[in-house]
């Protein structure tokens, strides 16, 4: 009886290190296009150009407190304990400008933030003065010697004209919005959000609103990935899950590549008979970047280029899928947005509990963070198998465990990759 020869190509995978995999991806990450959005829509977006100050800030000398604008030279005699009286010639509420000039023997009542009148060079606080009325005129008395510029914010104290305000690639937050508004930037140049197609493969998958059936599971990875993509600054588009059919997968991927900037799939990347994505990336018209990484979980994580666009084929195991997205998809989106720091931040922490697993590959262990006596500790998840789903929600970071034959002990110093939204409790 003749038998079809076993195709062993899918078993012959050359593993690359995480850093090498990231480097290969980075060479294909294309910078996004620019669009202008209203200031109220700019939060969370990434600036597409450097922004410089069109004017100094503040633009005028302003009072730092409620008091009186005076000439510091008038107070020189106060060093001997002598009290002086100055004629109050005007009052300046915030938002108005006086047309009076302060000269020797004069003072102007001024409010916090108001523009100093011409001639004045210092402000004495209200609490250090007293008033008297004489022949219908108001006089202010003080006994304290004042220095030039006291309680006065000078022109350009915070920002000089032409100074860099915000750098290209900055993720706009509340403080940045305040700066933009202050300088009248009502239309903000940002990068368009990368459009990312997401779908899962597997005949065992059910829609989230379908009742459970024997041997079936709900399609949770797609929604998890969509959230991760959104957090990274992308715009996810959830496509319909497909069955384990290579031709169907090829057509779905081609259609997605044509319509979106990035394509991310979950499932079908191992070496089984129904692992269709593993077969798809070996097609002649696909530029496979790698199909094995020296990491756990997610060693079968795969990346390829089709028609100049990146395809990420992630593991169907939730833990491995999550880690693969954080290490490879997130940085790609961030690079398309010109983020200065596309990769997860690395911290040093103490290991909060023994970790006994031995590893021939670098392991990224889901963990929580907490403070003990002023020291940051990373506590490994109790269940961290690649198939485990529930512990993802409790993860603040990924402990980076290098290849080891002995495991790690509580109290050892470890490196951790801090996840977006990770909190130290």
Residue ranges and their predicted role:
Residues 1-5, 11-18, 186-314, 318-324:
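Helix-rich terminal scaffold detector
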Residues 2-18, 69-240, 378, 382-383, ...:
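Short, glycine/charged-enriched hinge/interface segments at domain edges or termini
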Residues 110-112, 126, 167-168, 208, ...:
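Thr-Gly-centered strand-to-loop micro-motif
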Residues 13-20, 34-37, 41, 65, ...:
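Conserved active-site and cofactor/substrate-binding residues in soluble primary-metabolism enzymes
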Residues 35-40, 44, 49, 95, ...:
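Flexible glycine/proline-rich
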Residues 26-33, 50, 72, 116, ...:
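Structural signal for hydrophobic packing residues in well-ordered secondary-structure cores
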Residues 1-80, 109, 339-364:
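Short, low-complexity N-terminal leaders and the immediately following helix N-cap/first helix
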């Amino acid at each position: 009886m003749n038998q079809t020869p076993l195709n062993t190509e899918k078993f012959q995978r050359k593993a690359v290190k995480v850093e090498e995999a990231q480097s290969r991806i980075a060479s294909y990450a294309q910078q996004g296009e620019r669009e202008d959005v209203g200031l109220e829509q700019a939060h969370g977006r990434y600036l597409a150009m450097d922004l410089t100050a069109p004017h100094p800030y503040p633009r005028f000398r302003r009072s730092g407190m409620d008091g009186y604008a005076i000439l510091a030279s008038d107070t020189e005699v106060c060093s001997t304990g002598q009290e002086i009286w100055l004629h109050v010639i005007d009052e300046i509420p915030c938002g108005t400008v006086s047309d009076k000039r302060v000269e020797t023997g004069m003072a102007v009542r001024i409010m916090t933030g108001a523009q100093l009148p011409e001639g004045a060079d210092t402000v004495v606080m209200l609490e250090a003065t007293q008033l008297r009325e004489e022949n219908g005129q108001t006089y202010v008395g003080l006994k304290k010697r004042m220095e030039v510029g006291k309680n006065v914010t000078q022109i350009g104290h915070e920002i000089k004209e032409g100074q860099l305000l915000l750098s290209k690639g900055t993720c706009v937050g509340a403080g940045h919005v305040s700066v933009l508004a202050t300088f009248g930037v009502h239309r903000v140049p940002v990068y368009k959000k990368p459009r990312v197609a997401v779908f899962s493969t597997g005949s065992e998958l059910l829609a989230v609103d379908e009742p459970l059936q024997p041997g079936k599971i709900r399609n949770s990875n797609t929604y998890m990935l969509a959230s991760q993509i959104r957090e990274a600054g992308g715009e996810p588009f959830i496509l319909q899950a497909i069955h384990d059919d290579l031709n169907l997968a090829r057509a779905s991927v081609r259609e997605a590549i044509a319509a979106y900037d990035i394509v991310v799939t979950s499932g079908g990347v191992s070496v089984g008979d129904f692992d269709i994505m593993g077969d798809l990336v070996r097609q002649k018209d696909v530029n496979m970047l790698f199909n094995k990484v020296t990491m756990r979980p997610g060693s079968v994580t795969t990346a390829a280029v089709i028609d100049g666009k990146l395809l990420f084929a992630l593991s169907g195991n939730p833990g491995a899928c999550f880690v693969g997205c954080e290490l490879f998809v997130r940085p790609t989106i961030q690079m398309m947005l010109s983020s200065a720091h596309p990769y997860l931040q690395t911290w040093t922490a103490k290991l909060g509990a023994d970790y006994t697993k031995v590893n021939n590959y670098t392991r990224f262990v889901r963990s929580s963070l907490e403070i003990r006596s002023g020291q940051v500790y990373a506590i490994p998840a109790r269940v961290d198998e690649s198939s485990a789903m529930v512990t993802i929600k409790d993860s603040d970071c990924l402990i980076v465990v290098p290849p080891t034959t002995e495991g790690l002990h509580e109290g050892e110093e470890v490196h951790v990759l801090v996840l977006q939204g990770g909190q130290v409790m």
